[in-house]
Amino acid sequence: MKEKINELAGRLLDLPDSILDLQMQLIDRSAELQKVESQIGERSSEIKYIINNALDDNGKKLYSNAELRDAAFISDAKDDILLPSLNVDRELIQSSIQSIRVKVENLSNHQRNIRVLISYLTTDSNIDNL
């Protein structure tokens, strides 16, 4: 039983480093997400600028109301080369962040469980049974 306690204690000592590694990955992925979201915002603004300044053959605004501009944005955003790619990148990064969060939560739960188990196994009433 002492071997099991030592094994659990060793695992307990290793878990903080594993959790820290994942948290650092989370920070990196969050920074990547911010960058991609910024790029999406910039590209969306560029598309909207073009739409807002589009003129017909008579020099009048091509999209005279918000509904037309919104429809043009949706259409142009779909046809854009960069924006769909950035949206896919954002979704992949968000999925990765969720996965890392689940792993951190799992390791944290594992850490708490080991602490409780070691505490239980090393109490005076239980140590006599070892």
Kindly give the residue locations of the regions a language model identified:
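Short, charge-rich amphipathic alpha-helices with coiled-coil/heptad character
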Residues: 1-28
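Short acidic DE-rich linear segments
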Residues: 2-3, 123-130
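Short A/G/S/P-biased low-complexity tracts
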Residues: 8, 116-125
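Extended alpha-helical coiled-coil "stalk/arm" regions
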Residues: 30-72
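Long amphipathic alpha-helical coiled-coil segments
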Residues: 30-41, 81-119
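Short, glycine/alanine-rich amphipathic alpha-helical segment
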Residues: 56-94
